[in-house]
Structure formats: C-alpha cells, structure tokens
C-alpha cells in the first residue's frame, strides 16, 4: 500500500508498505526464493510520476517560494538575542542553562551556539562530574547532566545514579511520583554502554513506571510522555522530535518563545534549501535517463534524496554533500533492482566481475540491460571522487571502488543463496547483510564527502569508523527485517534475519524471535554509543552526528500502524518539506 503526499504542486507517492519479496514481482524476479527487503521501499512500478513532471513542479515552486532576502535582519537579531540569553543563564542559573542547552538541541537550533554551549558544558562538567556532588541534585537534573555530557564526549560514570537507590539496591520508591525525573532518567539510559547494568535497571524502572502511569496523566502530559517513551531524543531525529517538544516548553521558561521563533525561522531557511536540492536531484535523475532503460527499477528520486536529507539534517550548509550522497543512494537501489529483477545468476556473476574490474572495457561483457547502469555507475562515482579531490586535495577512488565491489559481492551471495533454495545461518546472514544493506556505501562516501581521510587531516582514518559503521548496519538491517515481518504476505521463507534465527531455534515462538531481534538492536546501540563516544575529535563531530542520524532514521522509515502505513514518516516528511 502506498499513500501520496502533495508536495510542491505534484503528487509524490511515498510507499511505506514492506518491500514484498514474493507478491510484487513474483513473475519477473529471478530470485524469489530468497529476497531481502532492503531499506523497505517497494518498487511500486507505475505509481511514480515521470521525473520530468516532478522537475516541472519543483521549478514552479522555486518561483513561488518566499524570498530569503527578507529573513536576515530579523533572523540575525533572533540569533543574537538567544545568544545573550544563554550567557545570562550560564552566569545566573547553571541548571537552567543546561535545560536551555537541551532545548536548543531538541528544537534543532543548537548549531548557532556551539561556542556558548561548549562553555556552559565545560563549567558544568567541572562542578558536577563527581558522584558525590551529584547526590545534592534532583533526579531530573542529574539525568539531564549525564545526557548532555555523554552526548558531547565528556565521560560521566553511571554510578551517579546510585544516589537514587535505597538500601535494598533498588531505585527509591518516592521516585515513582517524579514524572519529570523519570522521563529524563529514561532519556539518560539511552546513552548506555555495554556492561552498565545500572542504566539497564534505570531504563526498565523508568519505562515501567511511566507506562503504568500514562492512563492517569492529564492529556498533554500523557501525550508528551508517550512521545518520549516511543522516540527518546538520543535515538530519534531532533527535527522530528522537536515538533512535540515545542508543545512541551509551553510557558515554563521565558526564553521558550524566543527559541520557538528561531526554530521556525530555521525551518523556513531549511525548507527552501531542501526544495532547491530536490530540484537538483530531480534534474540529475531525469538527465541520467536510467529509469527509461530499466523500467522495472524503482523510479523514486524523492525517496533517494530522503536518506541524504535526514542523515545530514543537522548541517544545512552541507548542500553539495547531500546532493552528491543522493547519487550513491540511487545507485544502491538501481543495482539492487538489477540483482532482484533483471539478472540470471550467470549474468549477475558477470556484472559483479565487471564492477570488480572497474573498467569501461568490461561493458562489452554485460547484457544490454545492464550496460547503461554500469557505465553511469563508473561515471558517477569517478565524478564524485574528482569533486572530493578538487575540494579537499585527496582522491578516495580506491576506497569508493572497494565499497561498491563489496556491495555487489554481497548481492551476489544473496543470489546464490536464492539459487540454492536454502536459508543461511543467522550469523552468515547478518555478516553478509551488513554489507548488502548499503550502509557501508553511504557512510564511506559520506566520510570522504565531509573532507575526512586526507593525508593532511590526520585526526581520523576510515578504519577508525569500521565498528561504528558495523553497528549502524546491523541496526538498519534488523529494523528493516522487523518492518518486513509485519507484511501480511510473509510466509516464513523470505530470508530475513528472523527466518534464519527461527530455523536454528525451532522451539521459539514468533514473539520470542521478535524479542531476540529487539535485544540485538539494543546491544548494537550500546556498542554504537561507545564507538561514537570514542570518536571524540572536533574534526569528526559532523560525520559522527550524521552517522548516528542514519541509525536514528530507521524507526521513522519502518514504523507502521495496523494498515501498514507509516504515519510517523508521513508526519516528518510533511513537516520538513511542506510550507
């Protein structure tokens, strides 16, 4: 099932039903016996308007968009006014200054105040990092302090929460009445590392009490708490959660109105930029013309762009990077469709060999319907490498070629599993699907597009990010399979992680397998938290945030109601791209 969003005068289908492995193309797919649902966007052939129509709609909107020249005077004044408020709170009320910093992050305006925020956190860390000092503060204040410090690379021991336990070793009974503190404790627990048992206890305790109290809460509070339980800040996209946080601020602080106004101004600027970028992507896709040659492949430039937009949503100035990254995302889908729809096993072996050669002369060995895709892949990635070289002085083509070779090899493994008619072990599946998910391709391209890895940069190498990328790939893969498992067409032989794990544990129920998958996601988040924390260098902060956004985006992509639609993603898309 797909629903349509009216965007910029055009109707854009944004399909959210799981990408069916059997039902959609059972007569054309060469590999129906084994088909993963990658990134969960079905190829609903025929439902997407031709790119030329989308291009025209975007062009029309470009002329009707409100003039950006009207913004700067008031916009800059609002930024300066907020900066002044930050200074005042830092001097007069250290705890409220932390609440202020948290609010800027949740509303997505913190990028304006990096120096001020850093100074506030530095002072706060110097005075509160000791567990003995924290015992004089409330659960809310300690939890917020813990969150902010870990988010910004300052280590605070989880032992600070021992101050809120009684002699029994359990969290104190009176905390059950502290809704505000419990919500912040739940948020703090999302930043745990492996082995931090007290944070596991904190998450279970706070979640259980808050869920139990929801029914008795006043409507606005119930909605606020419910949203935070479902989408904790650390594992969500700030621009999305900020929709709800705007209501949470209410009239609690005199600076709330100022922050809301600044957030709305930011949103106006961002929408204009995103619309222009989508126009560029549409133009590139239309000129490429591959959708005319590969008529069964997914023809969805808007959806390709969504990944780049959300991953880099915190950095509006990285417009060139978003557009360039979208091209890589598009080719992940195109090559995926070649493996799923167009190629026999022998043809796919030849295609993989051609990618391994990375030479235009290999085009002659390919079937006609693969030649154009192969040549444009080489053109596009070689072009990306050249742009990176011109911008940063180093050429990453060898690394980029390697990641595309790995992706196609992983796709080929899937095709061979399909040809054999059997499921791999759960571990074999996960090791291969980490690669075939496309996560490594996206993040490695992003790594170099953001200027990292050059000989003169010195602070971080690509290999330093491998574990971080691995955890994100597993999170994406498992969430993808959990989303696909809700598809009514599933029959237990579709090649998901759940199917492979169930095959090895035949006594487990579907609910138990589902719970195991969620536990695996939780473990990988803890590893991701640690890897992210360890990559604590100014030069890598933007890449780290973008990589985390990749993992955070997954629940938005794969959150369904009973009708197999995605109300969460629909709301986010409309909010970010509609005037």
UniProtKB/Swiss-Prot annotation:
Gene Ontology molecular-function annotations: (E)-beta-ocimene synthase activity; magnesium ion binding; terpene synthase activity; tricyclene synthase activity
Keywords linked to the UniProt accession: Chloroplast, Glycoprotein, Lyase, Magnesium, Manganese, Metal-binding, Plastid, Transit peptide
Catalytic activity, as annotated: (2E)-geranyl diphosphate = tricyclene + diphosphate; (2E)-geranyl diphosphate = (E)-beta-ocimene + diphosphate
Span of chain positions assigned to the transit peptide in the UniProt entry: 1-66
EC number: 4.2.3.105, 4.2.3.106
Chief place of localization: plastid
Short motif DDXXD motif, span: 336-340
Gene Ontology cellular component list: chloroplast stroma
Induction info: Circadian-regulation with highest levels in early afternoon and lowest levels during the night.
Family according to the record: Belongs to the terpene synthase family. Tpsg subfamily.
Described function: Contributes to floral scent emission.
Cross-referenced PANTHER family: OS04G0344100 PROTEIN-RELATED, S-(+)-LINALOOL SYNTHASE, CHLOROPLASTIC
Descriptive protein name: Tricyclene synthase 0e23, chloroplastic
Source taxonomy: Eukaryota, Viridiplantae, Streptophyta, Embryophyta, Tracheophyta
């Amino acid at each position: 099932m797909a629903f349509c969003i009216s965007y910029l005068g055009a109707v854009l289908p944004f399909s959210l039903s799981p990408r069916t492995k059997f039902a959609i193309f059972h007569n054309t797919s060469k590999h129906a016996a084994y088909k993963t649902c990658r990134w969960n966007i079905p190829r609903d052939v025929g439902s997407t308007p031709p790119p030329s129509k989308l291009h025209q709609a975007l062009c029309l909107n470009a002329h009707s968009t409100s003039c950006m020249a009207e913004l700067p005077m008031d916009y800059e004044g609002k930024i300066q006014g907020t900066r002044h408020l930050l200074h005042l709170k830092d001097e007069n009320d250290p705890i409220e200054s932390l609440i202020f910093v948290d609010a800027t992050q949740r509303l997505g305006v913190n990028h304006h105040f990096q120096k001020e925020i850093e100074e506030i956190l530095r002072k706060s860390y110097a005075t509160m990092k000791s567990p003995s000092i924290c015992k004089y503060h409330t659960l809310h204040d300690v939890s917020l302090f813990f969150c902010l410090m870990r988010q910004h690379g300052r280590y605070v021991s989880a032992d600070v929460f021992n101050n809120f336990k009684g002699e029994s070793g359990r969290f104190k009974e009176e905390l059950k009445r502290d809704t505000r503190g419990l919500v912040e404790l739940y948020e703090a627990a999302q930043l745990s590392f492996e082995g931090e048992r007290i944070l596991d206890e904190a998450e279970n305790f706070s979640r259980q009490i808050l869920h139990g109290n929801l029914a008795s809460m006043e409507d606005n509070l119930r909605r606020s708490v419910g949203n935070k339980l479902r989408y904790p800040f650390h594992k969500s996209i700030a621009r999305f959660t900020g929709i709800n946080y705007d209501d949470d601020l209410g009239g609690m602080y005199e600076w709330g109105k100022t922050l809301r106004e600044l957030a709305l101004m930011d949103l106006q600027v961002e929408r204009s930029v995103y619309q222009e970028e989508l126009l560029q992507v549409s133009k590139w896709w239309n000129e490429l013309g591959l959708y005319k040659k590969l008529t069964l492949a997914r023809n969805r430039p808007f959806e390709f762009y969504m990944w780049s937009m959300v991953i880099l949503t915190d950095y509006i100035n990285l417009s060139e990077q978003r557009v360039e990254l979208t091209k890589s995302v598009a080719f992940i889908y195109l090559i995926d469709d070649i493996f799923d729809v167009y190629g026999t096993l022998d043809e796919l072996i030849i295609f993989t060999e051609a990618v391994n050669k990375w030479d235009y002369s290999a085009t002659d060995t390919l079937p006609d319907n693969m030649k154009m895709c192969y040549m444009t892949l080489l053109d596009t990635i070689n072009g990306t490498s050249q742009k990176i070289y011109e911008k940063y002085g180093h050429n990453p083509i060898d690394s980029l070629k390697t990641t595309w070779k790995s992706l196609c090899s992983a796709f080929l493994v899937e095709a061979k599993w399909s040809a054999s008619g059997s499921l791999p072990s759960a571990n074999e599946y996960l090791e291969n699907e980490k690669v075939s998910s496309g996560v490594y391709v996206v993040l490695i391209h992003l790594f170099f597009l953001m200027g990292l890895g050059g000989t003169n940069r010195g602070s971080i190498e690509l290999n330093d990010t491998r574990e971080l990328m691995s955890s994100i790939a597993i999170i994406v893969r498992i969430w993808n399979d959990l989303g696909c498992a809700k598809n009514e067409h599933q029959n237990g032989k579709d090649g998901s992680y759940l199917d492979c794990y169930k095959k090895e544990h035949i006594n487990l129920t579907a609910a138990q397998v589902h719970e195991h998958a969620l536990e695996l996601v939780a473990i990988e988040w803890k590893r991701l938290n640690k890897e992210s924390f360890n990559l604590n260098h100014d030069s890598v902060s933007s890449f780290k945030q973008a990589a985390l956004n990749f993992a955070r985006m997954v629940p938005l992509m794969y959150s369904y109601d009973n009708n197999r639609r995605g109300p969460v993603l629909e709301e986010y898309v409309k909010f970010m791209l509609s005037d």
